[in-house]
Amino acid sequence: MNSISASAIVLWKNTPLPFVVKSYPMSTLTTDWQHLANLALADECLSRDQARAVLQAPDTELLNQLAAAYRVRYHYWGNRVRLHYLLNAQSGLCPEDCHYCSQSKISTAEIEKYPLLSQEKILAAADRAAHLKAGTFCMVISGRSPSEKVFEQVLAAIRAVKERYPLKICACLGLLTPEQTARLAAAGVDRVNHNLNTSENFYSEICTTHTFRDRDQTLANIQAAGITTCSGGILGMGESDDDVIDLALFLRQRQVTSVPVNFLIPIPGTPLGEQHTLNPRHCLRILVLFRFLLPRQEIRIAGGREVHLRSLQPLGLYAANSMFIGDYLTTPGQAPHQDWQMIADAGFVLEDPEGRAIAP
């Protein structure tokens, strides 16, 4: 060893480092997450303690959790991503007091308020959905339940869209009777959405003008009519981990087909306008839990994706297999070309209405 290199070594050894590199042991939980994936693949339900462990795991376990969730997602859905397009077909003026909603009677948020759109405008929105490569066109109207006049107009719009486009149609119309769900089935609707939003235990904290059981009865009416159900929740409203688990378990018991996972967008003028409790890592853990507890279901990253997942949006697709493209009810979404690029960059492909893979 020459004198220069020896001196350099002595200098290096005697020079204090400006920072300390902390050593972390290799994960001891990776096998546990894979065990949970095995349970999901065997259609076995996680215990409550196992579900809590998913939500309460340290951030250092997040990639291991996502890897386990992706095994389940890939088993049932491959690397395909379903796109849904949302139309706010009737906005505002709702008599309900849902604390999260900018369209409720107690909201002072500045939003557009309008009656049901004309069939021409609904068809124009369906055309945009098709051009954005969405497989499902979601028609949403504000209000507790539709009047007979509005309901007839919605049925006519459903028929018109089905005649012109290969899109699947999901209708979100509020509380529905058995007679109304039977008429929706006859009109050719593919799916009806009615979100439970949170657990039964927490429900009275976010709404007092109707109950969790009112919403569940609508789901029962939809299923009795032979229509597939879409129902999920809004996370980040102040609920506990057990409330999140209870919601997912109830959706599993109800055997819903499609599960939108919304993350609260705190809108000024609503009672939850200052509610800021989520971070991107916890949102991803919620998606992992929903995949473990609802392994066969379509899990959709819905409202709040851009706000809460931010730069980690692509990671959500390792647990979820579906997302909205375009705007939400009263808040903007990410530009469609950014969504397509994100999907392609992550190595996923789109799914058309018939379940075939297409390029983003």
From Swiss-Prot:
It catalyses: (4R,5S)-dethiobiotin + (sulfur carrier)-SH + 2 reduced [2Fe-2S]-[ferredoxin] + 2 S-adenosyl-L-methionine = (sulfur carrier)-H + biotin + 2 5'-deoxyadenosine + 2 L-methionine + 2 oxidized [2Fe-2S]-[ferredoxin]. The keyword Transcription does not apply. Residues 79-305 form the Radical SAM core domain. SUPFAM superfamilies: Radical SAM enzymes. Its cofactor is [4Fe-4S] cluster; [2Fe-2S] cluster. [2Fe-2S] cluster binds at residues 138, 170, 230, 300. It holds the Pfam family Radical_SAM. Coiled coil: none annotated. Gene3D superfamilies: Aldolase class I. This is Biotin synthase. It comes from Thermosynechococcus vestitus (strain NIES-2133 / IAM M-273 / BP-1). The gene is bioB.
